[in-house]
Amino acid sequence: MIPEDDTTLSSLRPGDVRPELLAPAGDMDCARAAVANGADAIYFGLDRFNARLRANNFTLDSLPELMRFLHAHGVKGYVTMNTLIFTSELPDALAYLGYLNAAGADGVIVQDMGLARCLTEWSRRDPAMKLELHASTQMTLTSPEGLEFASRFLDLKQAVLARELSLKEIEQCARHTDIPLEVFVHGALCVAYSGQCLTSESLGQRSANRGECAQACRMPYA
């Protein structure tokens, strides 16, 4: 985290919002390291509906312990459900949301518009549903118009902009929406737009939008 006396923070103007530092974590060691080094929140996947199924992930059983640890240190935890959901999977996905809410997760980062709409409606009719809805970078929100369209139907508490945007494009989005925006400042870029790549599916029948990206764009070709 940037020290409080850092000139970047001291130059914030009245009314400016201090950025939230969000870090990924795949296990408790990573979570502890993120907390120890000043993260305001962490994001992580579980064993389903997660774009990084082949990475180290937490389990449903470990989630309550993780959330207790995070909240004891004033840190939030957001669960990634950043894949496309098949219609046949929707009941399981909704049950997942219920479990995440009961376990104390602060929010979910969602790609699928249908699932996002379901969570919006659930939150509106049931005050006990406390999960915040965050739009994933996989939702491909690239413009003020896209943000405006999404906000008509979804109660977004935060939107992760597509990773491919320039600083000028990010600024334009920020000027035209009241939705808090999140951007990646470190990490890999997709060869295509976030959430729109079909290369892995076309070449190896492993969909990047289902957590199975084979990273075909990084393979050597003769």
What are these regions (language model features)?
Residues K157:
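Long, basic N-terminal domains or extensions that often function
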Residues S143-G146:
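Conserved nucleotide-cofactor-binding alpha/beta core module
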Residues I2-L141, L161-L165, E169-A222:
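Active-site pocket-lining/capping segments in soluble small-molecule metabolic enzymes
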